[in-house]
Amino acid sequence: MDRRQHDYAASSGLPYAQQQQQQGPNFQQQQQPQFGFHPQHPQYPSPMNASGFIPPHPSMQQFPYQHPMHQQQQPQHLPHPPHPQMFGQQQPQAFLPHLPPHHLPPPFPGPYDSAPPPPPPADPELQKRIDKLVEYSVKNGPEFEAMMRDRQKDNPDYAFLFGGEGHGYYRYKHFLSMHPPGGPFDPPFPSSSMPMIHHPPNPMMSPSMNNVPGALAVPPIRQPPFPPFHDHHQLQQHLPQPHPFAPHARPDFDQSTHAFRGLSGPLPADVAMELNGVLGNLNGTKESIKSAKIWFMQRSPFAPALAEALRDRVFAMDDSDRQMHIVYLANDILFDSLQRRTNLHEFDNEALAFRPILGSMLGRIYHFPQNKEENQSRLEKILQFWASKEVFDQDTISSLEKEMKSGPPANTFSHSPIIAAHALQRPGMLQQPPNSNVSSTMNLEHLTNPVATQQFIPNVMPPGAFPGSIPLNASVPPPTQPPAGEKPPPYPLFPPGLIPGMVRKMQIGSGVPYSPLSPLDIPTVIPPSDTPQSEVLERVSKFFKEIGEVNPSEGPMGSESQDDYDNYERDSPQRKGGACIPPPPNLQVDPETGTYADGSTDKKSGSGRLGLGATADPNEPTQYDDVYTSYRKHRSTNYHTSMSARATTR
C-alpha cells in the first residue's frame, strides 16, 4: 500500500512536472514553516493558481496533519473534491496512507464551524443540571428554555443560561441534541422521564389502541400531544414573538389570548409518581399543605398537567375531608402565585392552569353526600375570598360558582398519569367489578351532550391499558362511593384549641371581677341518696369487721355492764375529825382549767365514758345523731379509760 513519492510524480501529467522543475528551490523554502508556525497561503492567487486551482479557506488549516519527514512540501487543500478529469493535474500528495483532512467528517455540520467542543464543567452537579435541562428543552421545545430563562434569571445555579460557567457546554449539548447525525430528530437521551408516546386525541375513536400494553400507555392530559421537534420551526412562525427589549416580558404568557404557554403535554412518569406520594401524605396540617405547595411551585412548568391530576384525584376520592385538603392546597398555590404577579389584572400561569378545572373540582365536592352542608358553606366562602382578593375576576368567579352549583359533568372522571402510576403499583385496584346495584340513571340527568356529539374526550384511558382490567364507564360512579340516600355518621369536626382559647378569653379581658361564692347558693339539705340506708349500714359494718375495729354505729365497745371505776363517785369522804389528808395528785383539779391531771373533768353520774365537751346524759338524741360523733365518743372513751388505768397503778 505504501508508495514512494516519484510514483505519484510518474502518474502525473508532463506539463505540471515541468512547471514544478522551473520553480526551483525558492518555492520549497517558501513552503517550509517558519518559527514553528504553519505556512500561510497568499492573499491573492499566485501565477501557479492560474490553471484553475483555488487556495483553501483559512479555517481548513486547523487540520494540517504535518509530519517531520514530509515538511519540505506543503500539500494543496481544496474546499471540495475536484472533478475526476483534474486528477491527472494534481500535485503528488505527501500524506501517509490515511484519509486527507478534506475527506474527514468535520465535528460540526457547518462548513466553517470547526471549533473544538467545549469541555464539560468541573462541577458534576452543574453538568447533571445542564444535561437534564437540555433533555427537557429538546423534548418540550424552545418554550421551555424561554420559560426557564425567565424564572431562573436570579438563580446562580442557572447562570449557564446567561453566559456563565458551562454556557458553551450547554449550547454544544443542545446543538448536538437538536441536530443528531442519525436523522432530523433522534433524541440521544433515554426517555425515562419524558415519554414520547403520542396517543391519538380520542382513544374511543381508535380501537387499535386497545392492544397497547399497560406499561407503555401513558395517556395525555386534556391537551393534544406536542408535535415532533422538527415541526417546531413551523410552529414558531405562527406563534407571536415577544419583544426583545421588554425587560419584564414573559415568553410563556400569550398577551393576546391570555392562555398558558408552558408545557402543555402529558405529565412525565417520574413527576406523576412524585405527585402520587405528595398527595398520599397530604393532610389538613399547615406544614403538610405548605410542603406540597413548595413541591408544586418547583414544578410549575407542568402546572396544567398537575392541576388536571389534582382534579382527577378529587374525583377518585371518597373522603370529603381529603377532598377539601386538595382544595386548600390549590388555594395556597393560587395565593403564592398572586404575590408574584407583576400586573394584578393579568392572570399568572398557575391561575390560568387552575381556571378550567376548578369548576368541576369544586362541583364534585359541593354535591358529595358526605359532610355536604359544611363543605358547601366552606366552598362558598372560598369563592368569596378569591373574589375579594382578586385571584380571579368577577366573571370567572361567577362562572366557577355556576359550574360548582350545577354539579360536575359525568364524563369528567378520568385516569391521569398519577392514577395510572398508582395503579401500576397496585395492579389489582381496577379489577373489582362495579356495583351492579348502583343505577346509572342517577347520572343521566347530568349528561347534557351525548357521547356521539363530542369531538374530543380528554384523559380517557384505553380499555386494554392494564392487563386484566375492565373498562370503566364514565357514567357509573366509583364503586367505593356511598349511595346518595345514605348519610354517614357525623364526624366530630371540633377544632383543636377552641376550649383553651375560650378559657383564656374568659380569664383575660372578660370584665367580670372575682367574687366569693354566696352562702345562699350552698344547699342546706343533703339530697337523698339512691342507695338504701340498710345497704349503707351493712357496707359500713363489713368495713369495720375487715379492719378489726368495732362499728361505732352499733354502740360503744365493751359489755353492757358499766365499769365500777367509771361510775365511781369521786366526792371526798366526809371526815369527822383529825387532820385532812389531801387527795392524790391525779384527783386534784386544776383551778384554772377545771380538769384533772389526766385531762378529764369532774364526772358526774353517767358521764364517765364521755370525752371533753360531752353532755352528762348519754341518752340524749344529740349524742348519737351521726356515726362521726359516736366514733369520736368511742375513741375518747378508750383514751380516758387507759389514762385512768395508768393513774390508778401509780
UniProtKB/Swiss-Prot annotation:
Segments forming domain CID: 267-408
Compartments where located: Nucleus; Nucleus speckle
UniProt key word Nucleus: yes
Biased composition (Pro residues): 98-123
Main localization (coarse): nucleus
InterPro entries membership: CID_dom, ENTH_VHS, Surp, SWAP/Surp_sf, SWAP1_C
The protein's assembly and partners: Component of the SWAP1-SFPS-RRC1 splicing factor complex which modulates pre-mRNA splicing to promote photomorphogenesis. Interacts with DRT111/RSN2/SFPS and RRC1 in a light-independent manner. Binds to the photoactivated (Pfr) photoreceptor phytochrome B (phyB) in nuclear photobodies.
Region described as Disordered: 1-126, 548-650
Name of the protein: SUPPRESSOR-OF-WHITE-APRICOT/SURP RNA-binding domain containing protein 1
